[in-house]
């Protein structure tokens, strides 16, 4: 007999956990749609040459390739060594680039899409690292140009999503890569590749600490003078304390740089100022975001605004949502310039971390809201009719199909996390009522049959408010 077990690197949930996970998906989807984003799904596998056009190195080593047994056998016989034709997607960005390039002649721009699907990476199996996981992405794609105003709207989406998720106080850290690169120019770091390397080091400050990053930047690999490194580290330590303070700090940055301020720095500051102004108009409270000059995002394709979101009371979880602005999404697939801005929520890892931190305790019980007890075999038709009426009234209802002891049926409802248990014995039927036991409040009451669904609906709505 084979021992049942799941492969490493996957998150498999019990029903109550799956309900909580599904509700998080529903909240994210609902908020994406409220902001006018359209749903897109792409195949779980793509053509290898298309998927891997922009990748290499570590990414390619983590890709799962798809090969039929027949093709595999033929390749072995012929001695062919080329990559398999198909590969599983490792993120949602590359499939989006292919999708927009393929359908750009029929899409309406700016194209606003959301995508919530599983992706696959051959990560080394370890705690908190997954080989199969959900990503929940939004992107706004322009043709030739895209207004910086969309960057503010994306921040408003982040605020809406995490406010409704209700998993704790959060804060969006906001920056602009042009500000970082313009400041590096002012410190004599002018080579583009060196700038990107410095930004990658800055992005590791929280993990490695200031001393380690300082030593790296001064060391042989970078060779930046110590005085300039100190200026860089002082600069990236900048944090705003309020909306007004953020604007003051941006003004001070330009003033301190003087008339010789690099044009890229000026442009980045202007973009941040507009984003901050519009975020305020969009109703995002100032405690929900901060200017943070250390936020760089490790991915090199970000060119402007960048975001990182974290839970204030659970800093150990790290970033729960990140993204930014990029200049040309699909340059490997089309000659059209397709700038965009977007974010991604890695929901599988976030859910695992929240569960590990105890944040998910008690969030969800069951998607079944009521259970009808089967008193005896003679009352089956009546029990089914009660359940039918409840379902018509919008109540998720389960019926016990076997006339077990009533106490056993109650035990089942309690264990399954069902709130309402409905009973209709001979006496209740004669009086046209049903008995309802609220297992959450430990109360029992009678309701006229015709009012059953509406009464339970009111009780459930009140529970949402509480």
UniProtKB/Swiss-Prot annotation:
Residues of the signal peptide: none
Keywords assigned: Aminoacyl-tRNA synthetase, ATP-binding, Cytoplasm, Ligase, Nucleotide-binding, Protein biosynthesis
Any single GO CC term annotated in Swiss-Prot or TrEMBL for this entry: cytoplasm
Catalytic activity field: tRNA(His) + L-histidine + ATP = L-histidyl-tRNA(His) + AMP + diphosphate + H(+)
One GO molecular-function entry: histidine-tRNA ligase activity
Class of enzymatic activity (EC top level): ligase
Xref: InterPro entries: aa-tRNA-synth_II, aa-tRNA-synth_II/BPL/LPL, Anticodon-bd, Anticodon-bd_dom_sf, His-tRNA-ligase, HisRS-like_core, HisRS/HisZ, HisRS_anticodon
Domain of life, source organism: Bacteria
Subcellular location as annotated: Cytoplasm
Identification of the protein by name: Histidine--tRNA ligase
Lineage: Bacteria, Pseudomonadati, Pseudomonadota, Gammaproteobacteria, Lysobacterales
Gene: hisS
């Amino acid at each position: 007999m084979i021992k049942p077990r799941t492969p490493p690197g996957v998150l498999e949930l019990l029903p109550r956990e799956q309900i909580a996970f599904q509700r998080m998906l529903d909240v994210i989807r609902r908020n994406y749609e409220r902001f006018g984003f359209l749903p897109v799904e792409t195949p779980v596998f793509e053509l290898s040459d298309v998927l891997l056009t922009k990748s290499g190195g570590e990414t390619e080593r983590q890709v799962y390739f798809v090969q039929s047994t027949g093709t595999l056998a033929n390749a072995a016989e012929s001695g062919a060594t080329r990559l398999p034709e198909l590969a599983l997607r490792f993120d949602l960005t590359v499939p989006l680039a292919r999708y927009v390039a393929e359908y750009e002649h029929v899409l309406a721009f700016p194209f606003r899409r959301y995508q919530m699907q599983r992706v696959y990476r051959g990560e080394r199996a370890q705690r908190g690292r997954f080989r199969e996981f959900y990503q929940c992405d939004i992107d706004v794609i322009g043709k030739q140009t895209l207004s910086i105003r969309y960057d503010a709207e994306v921040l408003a989406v982040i605020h809406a999503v995490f406010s409704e998720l209700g998993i704790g106080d959060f804060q969006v850290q906001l920056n602009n890569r042009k500000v970082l690169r313009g400041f590096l120019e002012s410190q004599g770091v002018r080579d583009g590749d060196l700038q990107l390397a410095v930004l990658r080091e800055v992005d590791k400050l929280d993990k490695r600490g200031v001393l380690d990053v300082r030593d790296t930047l001064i060391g042989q690999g970078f060779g930046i003078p110590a005085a300039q490194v100190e200026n860089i580290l002082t600069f990236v330590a900048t944090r705003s304390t309020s909306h007004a303070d953020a604007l003051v700090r941006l003004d001070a940055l330009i003033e301190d740089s003087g008339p010789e301020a690099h044009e890229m720095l000026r442009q980045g500051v202007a973009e941040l100022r507009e984003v901050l102004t519009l975020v305020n108009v969009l109703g995002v409270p100032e405690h929900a975001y901060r200017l943070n000059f250390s936020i760089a995002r490790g991915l090199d394709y970000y060119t402007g605004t960048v975001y990182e979101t974290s839970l204030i009371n659970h800093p150990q979880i790290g970033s729960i949502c990140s993204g930014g602005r990029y200049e040309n999404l699909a340059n490997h697939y089309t000659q059209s310039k397709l700038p965009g801005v977007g974010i991604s929520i890695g929901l599988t890892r976030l859910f695992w971390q929240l569960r590990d931190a105890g944040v998910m305790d008690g969030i969800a019980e069951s998607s079944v809201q009521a259970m009808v007890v089967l008193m005896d075999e003679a009352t089956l038709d009546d029990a089914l009719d009660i359940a039918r009426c409840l379902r018509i009234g919008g109540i998720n209802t389960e019926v016990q199909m076997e006339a077990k002891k009533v106490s056993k049926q109650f035990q089942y409802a309690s264990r399954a996390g069902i709130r309402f248990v409905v009973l209709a014995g001979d006496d209740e039927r004669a009086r046209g009522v049903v008995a309802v036991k609220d297992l959450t409040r430990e109360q029992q009451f009678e309701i006229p049959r015709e009012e059953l669904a509406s009464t339970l609906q009111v009780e459930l709505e009140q529970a949402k408010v509480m």
